[in-house]
Design a protein with these regions (language model features):
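Alpha-helical scaffold/interaction cores of sigma-54-like transcription cofactors
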Residues: 1-707
Length: 707
């Protein structure tokens, strides 16, 4: 007989669930289960990842949540009366139910959080449409009433749930674990359910995938509670049976109530939610009367072109480039996007807030004419297709840097302009890396800090190239020796290996902000401020991380606070006060010989991207003569291209011959002495030599960048 697990926790039930989503889905596939649910505690962090993994495996994904019910109202916060909350299982039957889950998990975080993200009965009743509800686990209201001998209260609650959900959407949940009181509880639930002709459903409250994972989930709980594994009073599960049991196991356990098994299939068949996101959710930028977003963008570009180029604005190259970009932008539906970013930059400029942009947006003449970017893409041979590829529609991505002491003003402006309910910061998830896993596990195993530090320091810490514990064991002889010689260290390392990659905490992206055309909870759930975001004027955080938001078509803008811009702005203020000269990012001289002399002497302290020891050494060897030399050095100073730095410097000083493999490559690579430094050079070469279109050249660039 087949069976579907409808009560399942993943690693996104933070420090409680030990089920990696991909491994969980893989195991369900091995067990030939037709469907599987995700029901994490109080959040929907993992639902999109789960949905995609399940669909890819050919398993039907069921979206749900195990929410927390407040003892009284979700706004009540009395330490004696409201500290304890109850669990409740909710599954989305359709799109309406999914949207109600978004609102339930959002309200629980934003309005009901008190020890746990809670909702109350009134809120649940208002958002019950499209949801299937069960009586829950042993920590739910009805089971708890029965365990604590309050049968009248259990009946009252049953009546309430039947009134709200009806007999077709409310199920009495039964579980079988090696726990003494659960036998008596199940008897009472069956007796109570019989009075209502209730539908029963079997679940297993899955918290880990395999039986042997119980020990690792126990370690996770100890990490969560900050307790030693040896502490007899710490929170722990009373049974090691909360794994993804097979259909055969579940059939044996519920042989006396077969309908509880078949109902899992019936519920799975009824639950149909499509998370195949379509389109983009960009706010419609408000334009003056008589304009559309398309015509207003064109109008602003013409004004900007006059300021940037003066009489040259009608140069055929400039005119053709502008018209091409505007056509591509409009065909992709991104007119409002550019107006939104323009407006942010306009506000910053008018408010005296220094800003700059980074990334491929510098290849856009539209962005340059709007004073979003400060670099002339035509003069510097920057390609628009590197930014927006006409052959592949994808959301533009312009990262904005603001002076860090005034970044919050920009966030306030965005929230006021588009609405607090349409703006949110972006969540991040911290996972246990090798060293962190060792230290977390050592703490609960009561291994002294000096001992674990010795072991942790044996794991190589290479920026950009994290090494797993398994790799370190294979590659670091001293670590392998400690592992082989000391049983305690062996146990520590083996346990930590299983902990690696487990989600440990939620944080906030340093710069990312979502700006939506509708209240964000129409599309995704939101979260209260996480660690690192408490001081932000934007008090909501998405429950979905960056990559998920991109796949949903949400507008994301990076508001990065940069101390370098603050220092520069203050320096220019001092110059104005002392010398009466006004400088900003548009008119600071880029060819000052004294500046390059200072850099050549290694005086790089405090200079963004140049002040590191290795970089400074190369700058001294290079003795830069112009800004192009500096730009090339910054581009080369990363793993891989760094190998070309000595040749670049020698060729620059005439100490090594410059060679081109084809005469047509000379104009492309002349400025970098025959060395490929920039991705745009590869794109131009593929067009000139390979006959690629510019769109195809960007596809080539992407393919190369993945190698």
């Amino acid at each position: 007989m087949s069976f579907v697990h409808l009560h399942t926790h993943t690693v996104y039930s933070l420090l409680d669930g030990f089920s990696n989503i991909k491994k969980l889905v893989k195991r369900a596939k091995e067990l030939e289960m037709p469907a599987l649910a995700i029901t994490d505690h109080g959040t929907m962090f993992g639902v999109v990842e789960f949905y995609n993994a399940a669909r890819e495996a050919g398993i039907k994904p069921i979206i749900g949540v195990e929410t927390y019910m407040a003892a009284r109202r979700m706004s009540d916060r009395d330490s004696k009366l409201d500290k304890k909350s109850s669990h409740l299982l909710l599954l989305a039957e359709n799109e309406t139910g999914y949207k109600n889950l978004l609102k339930i998990t959002s309200a629980a975080q934003m309005d009901g959080f008190y020890y746990y993200p809670r909702i109350d009965h009134e809120f649940l009743a208002e958002h019950s449409e499209g949801l299937i509800c069960t009586s829950g686990c042993m920590s739910a209201e009805i089971p708890r009433d029965l365990i604590e001998e309050r049968p009248e209260e259990a009946v009252r609650r049953m009546n309430w749930y039947y009134d709200v959900f009806g007999p077709d959407r409310f199920f009495v949940e039964l579980q079988q674990h090696n726990i003494t009181e659960i036998v008596d509880l199940n008897r009472k639930l069956v007796e109570l359910g019989a009075k209502y002709s209730a539908k029963f459903v079997a679940t297993n409250d899955v918290h880990y995938i395999n039986l042997e994972d119980a020990a690792y989930q126990d370690v996770l709980l100890a990490i969560q509670t900050g307790k030693s594994l040896n502490d007899p009073d710490r929170m722990r599960y009373d049974s090691q049976t909360f794994y993804l049991r097979s259909p055969q196991e579940m059939s044996r356990l519920f042989a006396e109530i077969p309908e509880a098994l078949s109902n899992t299939l019936m519920i799975a068949e009824r639950c149909n939610v499509d998370l195949g996101f379509k389109g983009y959710h960009i706010p419609e930028f408000p334009v003056p009367e008589g304009y559309t977003t398309q015509s207003y963008l064109h109008h602003l570009c013409e004004i900007g072109l006059e300021k940037r180029y003066g009489a040259r604005k009608n140069d055929p190259i400039i005119r053709e480039r502008l018209n091409f970009e505007l056509e591509v932008i409009h065909s992709m539906g991104f007119d409002s996007y550019f107006l939104i970013v323009w407006d942010l930059c306009r506000y910053a400029s008018e408010s005296g807030i220094w800003y700059n942009t980074r990334g491929s947006g510098a290849g856009s003449l539209v962005a340059y004419s709007l004073f979003i970017t400060l670099v002339d893409p035509i003069e510097h041979h920057l390609l628009f297709e590197r930014f927006l590829n006409p052959g592949r529609v994808s959301m533009p991505d312009i990262d904005l840097d603001f002076r860090d002491d005034r970044r919050s003003e920009m966030l306030v402006y965005a929230a006021q302009k588009y609405g607090d309910d349409k703006v949110a910061q972006i969540i991040t998830f911290g996972t246990m890396a090798a060293r962190g896993a060792l230290r977390d596990v050592a703490r609960v195993m009561e291994i002294p800090i000096p001992e674990v530090d010795k072991v942790a320091k044996l794991v190589p810490n290479i920026p950009g190239k994290p090494m797993s514990l398994s790799e370190a064991l294979a590659e670091v002889p001293d670590l392998k020796a400690a592992y082989d010689s000391d049983p305690k260290i062996k146990s520590l390392v083996e346990t930590a290996i299983h902990m690696e990659g487990t989600v440990r905490n939620a944080g906030t992206h340093a710069a990312g902000l979502v700006i939506s055309d509708k209240p964000i909870t129409e599309y995704l759930p939101i979260h209260r401020p996480t660690s690192g975001s408490e001081e932000s004027p934007v008090k909501t955080v998405t429950q979905f991380e960056m990559g998920i938001l991109d796949s949903m078509g949400m507008l994301k803008v990076d508001f990065l606070g940069l101390s370098t811009l603050t220092v520069m702005a203050r320096a220019c203020d001092m110059i104005k006060q002392r010398h009466g000269k006004e400088y900003d990012l548009n008119n600071i001289p880029l060819d000052d010989p004294e500046t390059f002399k200072l850099l050549s002497e290694g005086k790089t302290a405090g200079i963004f991207q140049l002040e590191g020891g290795g970089m400074t050494r190369y700058v001294v060897e290079m003795k830069p003569k112009n800004l192009d030399n500096i730009i090339a050095m910054v581009a080369l100073y990363r793993p891989g291209p760094m190998d070309f730095i000595p040749s670049y410097i020698k060729r620059m000083h005439g100490e090594e011959p410059i060679e081109y493999r084809h005469p047509a490559l000379e104009p492309i690579f002349r400025d970098t002495y025959g060395i490929p430094v920039y991705q745009e050079q590869i794109m131009r070469a593929s067009v000139e030599i390979g006959g690629f279109t510019r769109s195809e050249s960007d596809d080539l660039r992407k393919a190369i960048s993945k190698k």
